[in-house]
């Protein structure tokens, strides 16, 4: 929320291409959330490969979008400060993925004991 408030305060706008990229990342985060919830509901949880895969997909998407971002900044496809806010949002979404895998790992650990 703070990142978007600062973006708006500085009058920066994400164009459609940036929003599409962020939506792609948010879709993966949503899938990771769904996996985490399913893992939490599973009383016999021993395998969290679904969560590992979800986290991997989030990380790979972030890596790919970050590489695209660098090229877009080099080509002046959008304002530098807009790009900073975009990367900040991507990083926050990736952190959510980290938190979700940690929760699945804790749920698995709980069921192993």
Across the structure, where does each feature detected by a protein language model lie?
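Cytosolic, long alpha-helical scaffolding segments
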Residues: 1-113
């Amino acid at each position: 929320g703070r990142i978007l408030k600062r973006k708006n305060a500085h009058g920066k706008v994400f164009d459609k291409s940036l929003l599409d990229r962020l939506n792609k990342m948010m879709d993966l985060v949503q899938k990771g959330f769904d996996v985490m919830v399913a893992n939490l509901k599973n009383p016999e949880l021993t395998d969290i490969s679904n969560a590992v895969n979800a986290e991997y997909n989030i990380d790979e998407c972030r890596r790919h979008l970050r590489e695209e971002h660098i090229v877009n900044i080099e080509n002046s496809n959008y304002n530098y400060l807009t790009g900073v806010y975009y990367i900040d949002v991507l990083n926050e979404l990736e952190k959510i993925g980290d938190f979700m895998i940690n929760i699945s790992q804790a749920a698995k650990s709980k069921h192993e004991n």
